[in-house]
Amino acid sequence: LHGIEVPVQIQHGNTLNKPLSSWDDQVDVIITNPPFGGTEEDGIEKNFPSDMQTRETADLFLQLIIEVLNDKGRAAVVLPDGTLFGEGVKTKIKKMLTEECNLHTIVRLPNGVFNPYTGIKTNILFFTKGQRTQDIWFYEHPYPEGVKNYNKSKPMKFEEFETELYWWGDEADGFTSRVENTQAWKVSIDEVIARNFNLDIKNPYQEAQEVHDPDELLATYHTQQEEIAALRNQLKDILGTALQSSSNGDAK
């Protein structure tokens, strides 16, 4: 927490350990980097609607964020690529997100933002509750000149976002000042629906480039391994839920 040397009035606990329907407090702004790549303990998923239950932490937090936002409340949420392309419950959550909120911007971050803790590629989702999504703007955040990857001693800096800030515009007028360029492109909700809510949409202005740099190749390898591990956990979650449902059916 920037500038807070001695935090007070902070409660330690699991925010998800409470039925979703019991949240009465509503908030105007949420800025969060929820845990991702992990799963919750058995029973936590029961706090969520039966058709939206999962043990994957990031998916549960995204549902909670949508629930507790006020009408016209705004959120900025860091989520992994797996949320963008994931299916099953993830598809249902993304459908709900675009129907209940205006998911107006997704900033696609480069590899290594959270090095050395994780190499999973991440994104920042910006949305406002109370209006359906019509179009989603994507912005691909590039590495600064001369940088091939981030690390603990050379992390991402706020100054790198100056180009996004200049391009951002005003939500009040529907971001009419935004223009597509080599880093930014717009996708309609109709295209998103046709893709079954797969939001892993690549930059159409950037041709695929063959990479030979060893550091970049190694970073990509680690990212892919972590994404595989996340998908493996998701598959275990799906199979566990299916087996539990089957057991309950046999018991009846």
Regions found by a protein language model. Give the residues of each.
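Short, conserved SAM-binding/catalytic segment
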Residues: 1-6
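A conserved structural/catalytic subdomain of Rossmann-like adenosyl-cofactor enzymes
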Residues: 12, 17-252
